[in-house]
């Protein structure tokens, strides 16, 4: 489930920020607006509050405005997540189950989904600042934080910090910006003979 939350946080960060320092907000907004699509390989680590690694994942992701996400983690923890702006499908081949969520509900619960979301209303609950070559997006009440780092105007590192101190770090490699990605990439066909849990 941590992979689901983090991937959905990815699917929100392309858009408009409504709080925080105005110059930091505008700078981050400008960087994010330049990105209409993004494809990359990733390495993800989940760490506890002491920095101990709890989980390591790798895979590929694709993002496309306005709200499309494809996220595929490799074995041994293989999973696939597809979001099309309305629904999110999370497929775990090991347990042979597909869970379907309403994407708007995921946006409300996850700061990372702010990257793609074209509705700036969610940003009213976040502050944005820039220091140490990173943008920090912090929820005003629940303490969750999102850190975004860009290299040559490409998003290359994302860290999500939960209020209790757990960190999820995502390093992006072989980043390709604004290449054509077919809408078919964001269509999920439920495999035969799997359980479906529709929470949408």
Swiss-Prot record:
Regarding protein family, the annotation reads: Belongs to the LolA family.
Alphabetical GO CC annotations of the entry are: outer membrane-bounded periplasmic space
Its name, as the record gives it, is Outer-membrane lipoprotein carrier protein
Where is the major localization of this protein?
A: periplasm
**Record's function text:** Participates in the translocation of lipoproteins from the inner membrane to the outer membrane. Only forms a complex with a lipoprotein if the residue after the N-terminal Cys is not an aspartate (The Asp acts as a targeting signal to indicate that the lipoprotein should stay in the inner membrane).
- Cystine bridges: none
> Which Gene Ontology BP annotations are present?
lipoprotein localization to outer membrane; lipoprotein transport
Q: Name one Pfam family in it.
A: LolA
Location of this chain's protein in the cell? Periplasm
What SUPFAM superfamilies is this protein classified in? Prokaryotic lipoproteins and lipoprotein localization factors
Native source organism of the sequence: Idiomarina loihiensis (strain ATCC BAA-735 / DSM 15497 / L2-TR)
Q: Which keywords accompany this UniProt record?
A: Chaperone, Periplasm, Protein transport, Signal, Transport
The record, for CDD domains, names:
LolA (cd16325)
Tell me which positions the record assigns to the signal sequence: 1-18
Binding partners and assembly: Monomer.
